[in-house]
A protein has these predicted regions:
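N-terminal small-residue-enriched
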Residues: 1-122
């Protein structure tokens, strides 16, 4: 039977860019540094809308410096829209193991990303 989710990336590879990782953060006036997305699931396969959470470190950046942690955030967004907002791509890449395979990807700086909620304060 066909996969009811439609196409699903299991071994994704993305080309490196030309921006050093420290410049991705250092050039930010104000933004968020997200170190990991977790529990990502498809919401709409044709529009590539995914929902998930940040995990293992989400930080506020001001004046190019990490100034402190923020709570984990929920997102629901089209990955196609996110990729349309790429401002810079790191030259460094990482191999990340996932539930259904692995990905070799650089870090990205996006001009915008849609977060829809946050975890409760502790």
């Amino acid at each position: 039977a066909p996969n009811t989710y439609g196409p699903f990336p299991t071994n994704m590879v993305m080309a490196a860019g030309d921006t050093p990782m420290d410049e991705l953060v250092g050039d930010l006036d104000r933004g968020l540094l997200v170190t990991r997305f977790h529990y990502t699931n498809p919401v709409h396969s044709k529009k590539v809308i995914i929902t998930g959470m940040t995990r293992d470190g989400t930080f506020l950046v001001e004046g190019g410096k990490v100034v402190g942690p923020v709570r984990n955030l929920r997102f629901t967004m089209s990955y196609l829209d996110a990729l349309a907002n790429v401002e810079a791509v790191s030259r460094e890449r990482r191999c990340l193991r996932g539930f259904l395979g692995a990905s070799v990807v650089p870090s990205l700086r996006l001009s915008s990303f849609s977060f829809t909620g946050a975890t409760a304060a502790e």
